[in-house]
Amino acid sequence: GDVGTYNGGDCIMTGVNAVTLGGSLYWVDMVGNRTAPVIFGPRRVVLLAGRNKIVDTQADAERRVQQIAGPKNVARHTGFRTPCAVTGLCADCNSPQRICNSRVWLERCYPAGRILVLLIDEEAGL
C-alpha cells in the first residue's frame, strides 16, 4: 500500500516514486502535494522507499513510474478513466484526470542533511 503523507509543520514524511543508485530521487505527482513540501517547507523531510523503488539510472526511474507505479496508482482511484487506468499502459495522455502532471528530480538538498531517505528492505508502496 501507499505510505501516505504526514505533514507536521516542522517535518514531513512521505514516499518517493524512485531512488537511483546514484542517489537521485524522482516523483511524479498530480498536484504537487508531495513534491512541494519536499523541495521547500519543513525543516526536516523523511522519505520512505521500499527496495522495489531502487533503480539503476534516471531512465530506469522514469520507465518504472511510467510502466508500473503510474498505472497502478491511477487504478486505485475509482472513476478515473485515463488510458493507463483502462489499459494499464501509459499513453502520455492529455486527460484532466492525469496524475502525472508534475515530474520532479531531486539531486541534492539544501541545507545538507534536511532530507533523510529510509530504505525499507521489502516491497513497499507503488
Features from the language model and the residues they span:
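Conserved phosphate- and dinucleotide-binding cores of soluble alpha/beta proteins
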Residues: Y6-L126
